A protein has these predicted regions:
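Phosphate- and other anionic-substrate recognition elements at nucleic-acid/protein interfaces
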Residues: 1-158
Length: 158
């Protein structure tokens, strides 16, 4: 199963694509979609929407996972991601920041460095993914991979 983790942001949208199979998780790719301060609000939203669509086409994920909209500061960006996933017919799953931290580190109150270090270790990466947004997106993908099973549907956006 391919999972696309997303860390929605207005200036930078982080992404992390992983493959989860038989309890093993491997990184396919990670990175960011960026906007610039010179862009108008509609231009930024269009770039984020188009970037998300491109990621969905490139990695063809089975599921898309990201931080719960309610907790996210920029719900407009998160809604663009949700719209692109919905248009592609993909199930979208959301997790609270505490759930992601608990799943990845074992501590729902872990700090950013603890999260990044565990993402690096769990995914057997040479170094902590940069920028931070990409590491956060990989964290969302890891959280979803850990949640797969009969109970995963409770996290699905309906």
């Amino acid at each position: 199963m391919i999972i696309l983790g997303i860390d929605p942001g207005y200036a930078i949208l982080g992404y992390g694509a992983v493959e989860a199979e038989r309890g093993k998780i491997r990184v396919i790719d990670y990175g960011v979609v960026e906007t610039t301060p010179k862009m108008t609000f509609p231009e930024r939203l269009e770039r984020l929407y188009a970037g998300t669509k491109l990621l969905l086409e490139r990695y063809r994920p089975d599921h898309v996972a990201f931080e719960e909209l309610f907790f996210y500061r920029n719900t407009t960006t998160a809604l663009q991601v949700a719209a692109a996933a919905q248009q592609a017919g993909l199930p979208l799953y959301e997790y609270t920041p505490m759930q992601i931290k608990q799943s990845v580190t074992g501590d729902g109150h872990a700090d950013k460095l603890q999260m990044q270090t565990m993402v690096k270790l769990l995914l057997k990466l040479q170094k902590i993914p940069k920028p931070d947004d990409a590491a956060d997106a990989l964290g969302a993908a890891l959280c979803h991979a850990n949640a797969l099973g009969p109970m995963v549907e409770q996290f699905r956006i309906k």
